[in-house]
């Protein structure tokens, strides 16, 4: 899978002529403002958040460059995937977890001001992270998480197909270049983006670690069977399956994406990466407690922590991608900017990998760091908790929990990390 680099470069060059004073499109913010079309329904599918499948509208906010005439009639699309641990914000015990998060909104706006169209999409939630049943708790945690990831990949693919369908039959309302679709995943969204790019064979989800050893019929989990039941859920693209487990959306259109960026997150297994997969960039805290930077186990942060499944993080993923030649399109570009120089000083020669080293967590060195590009407000978190039926103290707890792995959190600090993301990622997409 390879993006149309020549076409993107030519389009970017024409745009640059229109904005010579301001800078080069995609590399700098050449548009003064952003137009947001909120809550566009891109698909409908069954969510199991309450335990009973419910058909739900899945929505996205679409960010477009504005404030100046746009000479491009077909613009690259970024599908943005927010964080949240597959549990709704506040319910998940944190101050983040929706497409309205400060970091998600800011990153989408910055991409749009550079000339991309950005779809900031919701996806289906729901798993059982805290099940501690001594007999089958591990299988329930692992199985329900894998099903959550699987459903979210189906949702992201439905979103991609929505835009290709719109371009084909609806006069391309958002002026999308159907040959240039990119995924950018933050935190949990990083899991979605990475696994979207590599999962394509049923055999990949029947590895021994993805087979249940116990029965949990309430969850559709049975000993000796894969956690993911494709006969019920449909295939990786969300095609097939049965109600009330899957609802097909926009069949017949391509799911192809041309580039993948993960800000944290992980991949289910290194064997899933193959030659020809989309180019990948990984930006990852080296001491991330939620998604290992290298090879490790995903844990639920309870007391004591509950193991879920072993995965690989950006440190291993980008190494494999480079070894297979998937990042050849930018691997030898010879970037000499300060962001590249910093990344290259600590990434063991793995171009496209930016390890984030922040020193010891001052609250507790064992906690590590996660999401330094995020910021949140105590009062807003309290108000959101109240709006969801909780006491304000629930907001206090969520705010405090988020600070544990982002102890120096503030807007200026977060924006500095977002600046790093933009200046590392965009030259590699455009090259």
Where are these regions (language model features)?
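Cap/lid segment of the alpha/beta-hydrolase catalytic domain
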Residues: 86-101, 116-150, 342, 398-403
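Glycine-rich nucleophile elbow surrounding the catalytic serine of serine-hydrolase chemistry
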Residues: 185-195
């Amino acid at each position: 899978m390879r993006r149309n680099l020549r076409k993107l470069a030519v389009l970017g060059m024409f745009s640059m002529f229109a904005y010579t004073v301001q800078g080069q499109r995609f590399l700098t913010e050449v548009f003064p403002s952003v137009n947001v079309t909120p809550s566009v329904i891109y698909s409908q599918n069954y969510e199991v958040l309450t335990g009973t499948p419910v058909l739900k509208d899945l929505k996205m906010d679409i960010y477009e460059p504005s404030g100046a005439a746009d000479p491009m009639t077909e613009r690259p699309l970024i599908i943005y995937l927010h964080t949240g641990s597959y549990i709704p914000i506040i319910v998940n015990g944190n101050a983040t977890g929706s497409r309205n998060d400060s970091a998600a909104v800011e990153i989408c706006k910055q991409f749009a001001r550079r000339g991309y169209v950005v779809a900031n999409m919701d996806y289906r939630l729901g798993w059982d992270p805290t099940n501690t049943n001594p007999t089958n708790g591990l299988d329930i945690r692992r199985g329900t998480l894998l099903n959550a990831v699987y459903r979210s990949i189906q949702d992201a693919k439905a979103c991609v197909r929505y835009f290709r369908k719109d371009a084909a039959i609806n006069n391309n309302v958002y002026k999308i270049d159907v040959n240039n679709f990119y995924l950018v995943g933050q935190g949990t969204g990083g899991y979605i983006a990475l696994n979207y790019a590599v999962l394509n064979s049923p055999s990949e989800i029947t590895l021994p670690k993805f087979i249940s050893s116990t029965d949990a019929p309430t969850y559709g989990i049975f000993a000796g069977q894969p956690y993911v039941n494709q006969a019920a859920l449909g295939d990786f693209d969300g095609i097939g399956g049965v109600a009330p487990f899957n609802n097909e959306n926009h069949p017949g259109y391509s799911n192809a994406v041309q580039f993948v960026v993960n800000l944290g997150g992980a991949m289910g297994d290194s064997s899933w990466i193959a030659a020809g997969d989309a180019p990948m960039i990984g930006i990852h805290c080296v001491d991330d407690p939620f998604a290992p930077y290298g090879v490790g186990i995903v844990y639920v942060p309870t007391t004591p922590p509950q193991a879920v499944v072993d995965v690989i993080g950006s440190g291993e993923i980008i190494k494999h991608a480079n070894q297979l030649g998937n990042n050849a399109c930018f691997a030898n570009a010879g970037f000499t900017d300060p962001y590249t120089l910093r990344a290259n000083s600590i990434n063991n020669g793995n171009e496209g990998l930016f390890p984030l080293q922040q020193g010891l967590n001052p609250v507790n060195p064992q906690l590590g760091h996660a999401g330094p590009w995020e910021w949140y407000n105590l009062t807003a978190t309290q108000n959101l908790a109240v709006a969801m039926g909780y006491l304000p103290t629930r907001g206090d707890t969520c705010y405090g929990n988020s600070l544990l792995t982002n102890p120096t959190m503030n807007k200026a600090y977060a924006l500095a990390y977002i600046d790093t993301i933009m200046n590392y990622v965009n030259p590699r997409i455009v090259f």
